[in-house]
Amino acid sequence: MPNASPASPLNAPLAELEQRDAFIGRHVGPNATEIATMLAAVGAPDLDTLIDQTVPPAIRLAAPLPLEGPKPEHEALADLRAIAAKNVIRKSLIGMGYYGTHTPAVILRNVMENPGWYTAYTPYQAEIAQGRLEALLNYQQMVIDLTGLELANASLLDEATAAAEAMTMARRVAKSKSNVFYVDEACFPQTIDVLRTRAGLFGFELKFGPAHDAANADAFGALLQYPNERGEIIDLSGTVAALKAKGAVVAIASDLMALVLLKSPGTMGADIALGSAQRFGVPMGFGGPHAAFFATREANVRAMPGRIIGVSKDARGKTALRMTLQTREQHIRREKANSNICTSQVLLANMSGFYAVYHGPQGLRTIAARIHRLAAILAQGLRDAGFNVPAGAFFDTLQVDTGARTAELLAACDAAGFNLRPVSDTVLGLSVDETTTGDDVATLLRLFGASGELAALDAKVGAAGGAIPAALLRDDAILTHPVFNTHHTEHEMLRYLKKLQNRDLALDHSMISLGSCTMKLNATSEMIPITWAEFANLHPFAPREQVRGYLEMIDGLAGYLKAVTGFAAISMQPNSGAQGEYAGLVAIRRYHDSRGDTHRRVCLIPKSAHGTNPASAQMCGMDVVVVACDERGNVDLADLEAKVAQHADRLAALMITYPSTHGVFEESIREICASVHRHGGQVYMDGANLNAQVGLTSPATIGADVSHMNLHKTFCIPHGGGGPGMGPIGLAAHLAPFMADHVVAATGDETRPNKGQGAVSAAPFGSASILPISWMYIAMMGDTGLKLATEVAILNANYVANRLAEHYPVLYTGSQGRVAHECILDIRPIKANTGISEVDIAKRLMDYGFHAPTMSFPVAGTIMIEPTESEDLGELDRFIAAMITIRNEIREVENGAWPTDDNPLKNAPHTQADFIAADGAQWSRPYSREQAVFPLPWVAENKFWPSVNRIDDVYGDRNLFCACVPIEDYAS
């Protein structure tokens, strides 16, 4: 047990003094004494007994996890550093949507490496997320300005999935009745790969051809690339107009850096613009994570995927920000949702937005102009040397006819430290980026045998005015809002970042007990490797011999995950939990199709399921059939059996979460899986609650055929304020041949019998650069630590449930009165009696310095608490004290001491303006100011002040405004 030691360390053996398990005691919050205290409180003599009372014996593992023992932090870092050293860093000129960039140090240190930014949750509780929301609004404004469209969302997962979302959005809003979607053949190949996967599942017909031929197509929509993958810049205005005249919806995939200079997609008439924001300060990271941008016309807002930040007002009339139009999202509309996307890429979107804030419009124009100038110099030098370089307009990318010298030149550039793109046996591609230097261009020209001097070439290019005709340059102002024209010194930027951070509550302040979200410790030692150059600066399509370290780390992590889940194969490609669901269901569908069972399209989903489940099933072309739950929160076995029998001939899958979203280990889970299997279906296990399984049971042991793992929950990747996430899937052997592959780069398993399965994400290993976080966590915890983490997560949840049960009914428990790793408190009786709702309790918790638990999921009118294993007894007791004090405040309403509409809950959260009565009014509420803002003695010691009062959600949805507001509005 961590933290236990003999009376004198001088008497301890060396094996103990080595402290190889020290990290376990850093990660698991309660020490041995606190564990004993909590066990006594819940009436269990030891952890083993508690687990026996909680987890059904039929699904328990028969042996410990087949993993090594724990490693000390320094040793795990050294081991991973040795693996990373096997990667070879080259100056990348591959392009294809991934480019070198300089992350400003002030953003790297104060955002990317700052737990105040990376440990926050998605900003559902907007009053304590105003800093992040302002940053995202800046990002949206940046995208709006550069794309020339009216509305942008707060990011999608990557450019390729954004293109797939554009295709499905086009189908929703297009007037054309065609089933054809036209794709510019000069789109990036990874985008085409993802489009093929999505279109096949929806039954869309893809038609490929040159962009200029799109106007002749009878299609419901089209995707055009600008600049295209060959680097060409073509004015698409006429093509767009012709397509729209036929009732088609037109999407343009573009490049934000190019759009600093180029005519915008909106100006050319596009309905949708999308692409990657990666080159705005986010490292390539072997494929991700990066924020994809997505913009459209305001008329399409209700059909747009992803989250949107909008402007509203608070109870004092002050400008306040929130996520707007949430009724579009999967957690509300389920199988009718626009998309299954839940987690997106908030941390990376914020970094890209801050990149624009820091550089401003003039700085960005200088960066973009420099990139173009270097590309133009390179083109001119190559032409002068006799190479055939296409004469059309370009921004940063050239495709050079190298003929029989292609292999020789590629090898020479490799030896000199450059990666070029081998387009074919006779053509090489070169993409210039922010990190390219004049010396690089001079070296490349020398390698190609060109003799021109850089200065002379520069003068020649300058006299010609570059390689972009005036008609293709933008003539409108961009980024005119003051936020993009103020913070250009490091002092000002640093203070702006700190001001925003101070408005947000993250794990660096207090526990975040969101049920089904697993907001556990994101240890510093786990985070350190993601900024190592060996992981951060590799292109996802770099030659395989240069990425041996990445492949070894990924293979090692896959081995860890196989041990934890019991599955035969792991696919790392899905870059969110929802994408994992999608990838797993795709594998199931293709498995059935391979057996001739193309009619198996029914997916059974319990009523309690997360909204992504039905949304993902719908995306895979499956028909969702809902299974009822009984009064104990379990799957209703009679209803399941009836529906399994009813749909036996068409049954494709059951999607089920375990432990259930009701926070209990269902004892009939094996029977449920067996019933589905008997009728020809497959079992998809949602891995949202895997944190209650690790080391005790596993998806494969339970009977699942495929499951995703939320690495941003169970395996310590931080939530980033709403992303990044990773959702790799584990598959049984019979499904392994049907997991995603990739058209550009191998996914690591060269022996799979089935090829051409298609991609679900842009990069072969998804957001590869954050995988070291999970590798470090598992390496440092080892077999014993992972099991202890699960046991303590269950103990902490039972302790919270036990302490709060006399104040709030615990809605569901197992047969022996235990909950799993989370518990649901029923607020409905309180609301019926007083009008005080779960929302009021959530807002009041802000006054105590806590983020609310999950509200109204999976049962309306409830709150779901998941404390995780990382919170110690002191923090649990503070949260419990806050909840009990709030219940006593509710009793004051129940007994008539406070009005139902004027009490600390209905008026929560309280701000500094409330406390000091800034408007000069006297305090006139029936409770004291101290009760409002310092309700318990310890609150004042570390007070978190919400920066706004309760936000008016209805006003925000009815008065849609999703761009930056005047600066003075923030002070109103």
Swiss-Prot record:
One of its GO terms (molecular function) is glycine dehydrogenase (decarboxylating) activity. Its EC number is 1.4.4.2. Belongs to the GcvP family. GO terms for cellular component: cytosol; glycine cleavage complex. The keyword Disulfide bond does not apply. Its cofactor is pyridoxal 5'-phosphate. Keywords: Oxidoreductase, Pyridoxal phosphate. The keyword Oxidoreductase applies. HAMAP family: GcvP (MF_00711). The modification N6-(pyridoxal phosphate)lysine is found at K713. InterPro entries: GcvP (IPR003437), GDC-P_C (IPR049316), GDC-P_N (IPR049315), GDC_P (IPR020581), PyrdxlP-dep_Trfase (IPR015424), PyrdxlP-dep_Trfase_major (IPR015421), PyrdxlP-dep_Trfase_small (IPR015422). The glycine cleavage system is composed of four proteins: P, T, L and H. It comes from the Bacteria. The glycine cleavage system catalyzes the degradation of glycine. The P protein binds the alpha-amino group of glycine through its pyridoxal phosphate cofactor; CO(2) is released and the remaining methylamine moiety is then transferred to the lipoamide cofactor of the H protein. This is Glycine dehydrogenase (decarboxylating). One of its GO terms (biological process) is glycine decarboxylation via glycine cleavage system. It catalyses: N(6)-[(R)-lipoyl]-L-lysyl-[glycine-cleavage complex H protein] + glycine + H(+) = N(6)-[(R)-S(8)-aminomethyldihydrolipoyl]-L-lysyl-[glycine-cleavage complex H protein] + CO2.
